[in-house]
């Protein structure tokens, strides 16, 4: 009885995952290859992947293609070119959090640089990445050597940007004055640390 329920559960899960392939047009697109992903890295090529920003039904196709692209090019670099592609491949992943999860991306982004491949991950906020990749999000961010922040209001991102900038040392002067029969003045000087930019300043 238990085995039967398990098998039924597996079939239901499989059916749900494969449901988009009930669409004839999608089956046709996936039935043959005309993109020549294996040629990218051999010659200068521009490949645009455009998806709906309101309907996520086919996002898995984009994620699957990008996963295959990274793995294919890494293998090609090692097998045919001694480790590095002859033409640099740059992936500009706008709305990265909306294309679906790329399997093993935390490991891919750590290795593609040496193969002459780079990826620019564009997000609305860092919380998007953490929602998609959970514990692997920090690994992905750690393998990005440049961060460009164009502003935003999401508190977690603002805090992380402020911490990333670090602190500066400032000179702090405190003065005191005592008013009585004999006036006295005091001056206290010390160095202290201050966030280079606070969350409010970044926003």
Where would I find each of the regions flagged by the language model?
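Structural recognition of the conserved hydrophobic beta-strand(s) that form the central parallel beta-sheet
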Residues: 118-124
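Conserved residues at beta->alpha junctions
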Residues: 52, 123, 152
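Preference for short coil/turn "hinge" residues that link or interrupt alpha-helices
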Residues: 30-33, 92, 122, 190, ...
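P-loop NTPase motor core of the ASCE superfamily
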Residues: 44-47, 107-110, 128-203
């Amino acid at each position: 009885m238990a085995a039967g329920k398990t098998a039924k559960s597996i079939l239901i899960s499989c059916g749900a995952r494969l449901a988009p392939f009930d669409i004839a047009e999608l089956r046709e697109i996936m039935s043959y290859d005309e993109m020549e992903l294996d040629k990218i890295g051999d010659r200068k090529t521009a490949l645009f992947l455009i998806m709906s920003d309101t309907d996520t039904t086919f996002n898995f196709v984009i994620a699957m293609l990008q996963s295959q692209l990274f793995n294919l090019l890494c293998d090609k670099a090692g097998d045919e070119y001694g480790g590095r592609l002859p033409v640099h491949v740059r992936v500009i992943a706008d709305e990265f959090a909306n294309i679906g999860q790329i399997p093993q991306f935390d490991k891919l982004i750590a290795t593609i640089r040496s193969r002459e491949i780079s990826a620019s991950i564009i997000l609305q906020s860092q919380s998007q990445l953490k929602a998609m990749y959970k514990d692997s999000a920090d690994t992905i961010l750690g393998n990005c050597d440049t961060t460009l922040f164009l502003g935003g209001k999401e508190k977690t991102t603002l805090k992380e940007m402020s911490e990333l900038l670090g602190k500066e040392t400032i000179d702090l002067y405190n003065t005191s004055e005592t008013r009585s029969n004999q006036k006295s003045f005091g001056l206290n000087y010390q160095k202290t640390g201050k966030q280079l930019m606070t969350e409010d300043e970044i926003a």
